[in-house]
Curated annotation (Swiss-Prot):
<feature type="binding site">
    <location>
        <position position="93"/>
    </location>
    <ligand>
        <name>Mg(2+)</name>
    </ligand>
</feature>
<dbReference type="GO" id="GO:0004635">
    <property type="term" value="F:phosphoribosyl-AMP cyclohydrolase activity"/>
</dbReference>
<dbReference type="GO" id="GO:0000105">
    <property type="term" value="P:L-histidine biosynthetic process"/>
</dbReference>
<dbReference type="InterPro" id="IPR002496">
    <property type="entry name" value="PRib_AMP_CycHydrolase_dom"/>
</dbReference>
<feature type="binding site">
    <location>
        <position position="95"/>
    </location>
    <ligand>
        <name>Mg(2+)</name>
    </ligand>
</feature>
<keyword id="KW-0963">Cytoplasm</keyword>
<keyword id="KW-0368">Histidine biosynthesis</keyword>
<comment type="pathway">
    <text>Amino-acid biosynthesis; L-histidine biosynthesis; L-histidine from 5-phospho-alpha-D-ribose 1-diphosphate: step 3/9.</text>
</comment>
<comment type="function">
    <text>Catalyzes the hydrolysis of the adenine ring of phosphoribosyl-AMP.</text>
</comment>
<dbReference type="Pfam" id="PF01502">
    <property type="entry name" value="PRA-CH"/>
</dbReference>
<keyword id="KW-0460">Magnesium</keyword>
<dbReference type="GO" id="GO:0005737">
    <property type="term" value="C:cytoplasm"/>
</dbReference>
<comment type="subunit">
    <text>Homodimer.</text>
</comment>
<keyword id="KW-0862">Zinc</keyword>
<keyword id="KW-0028">Amino-acid biosynthesis</keyword>
<dbReference type="GO" id="GO:0000287">
    <property type="term" value="F:magnesium ion binding"/>
</dbReference>
<dbReference type="InterPro" id="IPR026660">
    <property type="entry name" value="PRA-CH"/>
</dbReference>
Length: 150
């Protein structure tokens, strides 16, 4: 499979906003933000980042690939856990500096490394003048210890 090459974004804002060439606008680290939701029910699953290679692999294979900022490398989401993300649709925002993946999750139907369906399982509430976290979805679809050995 040959590597997709993305053209440089146009300086003309209207060209970015219309149909035509997809010219993603990567940040100064070479990354683009990826918002990921469930293709069936629309639940927000995760927010991640992609470099050009991860984005190209995602488009070409139909399986979500991301760039890990902490590990400094590309990873196929779900490769270890079995919770692969099959991409059903990819959208971009008006100025092409963020993308939205609508996915189906295989395996345990979990996206978060904690074993939960979504990485957004906590709310933030102000108590006694201090921001605090509350867990609102504690259902584990798998045990991270069993899957990752952590």
């Amino acid at each position: 499979m040959s590597q997709l090459i993305f053209s440089q974004p146009s300086e003309d804002k209207s060209a970015l906003e219309d149909a035509g060439d997809f010219t993603p606008r990567f940040d100064d680290r070479g990354l683009i933000t990826a918002i990921v939701t469930d293709a069936g029910d629309g639940e927000l699953l995760m927010v991640a980042h992609m470099n050009a290679q991860a984005l190209a692999l995602t488009i070409q294979t139909g399986t979500a690939h991301y760039f890990s900022r902490s590990r400094g490398k590309i990873w196929k989401k779900g490769e270890t856990s079995g919770n692969l993300q099959t991409v059903k649709e990819i959208r971009t925002d008006c100025d092409q500096d963020a993308i939205w993946l609508k996915v189906e999750v295989a395996g345990h139907d979990a996206t978060c490394h904690t074993g939960r369906r979504s990485c957004f399982y906590r709310t933030i509430a102000l108590r006694d003048g201090k921001p605090m976290l509350d867990i609102v979805d504690d259902e584990r679809h798998f045990d991270p210890q069993d899957v990752y050995g952590k």
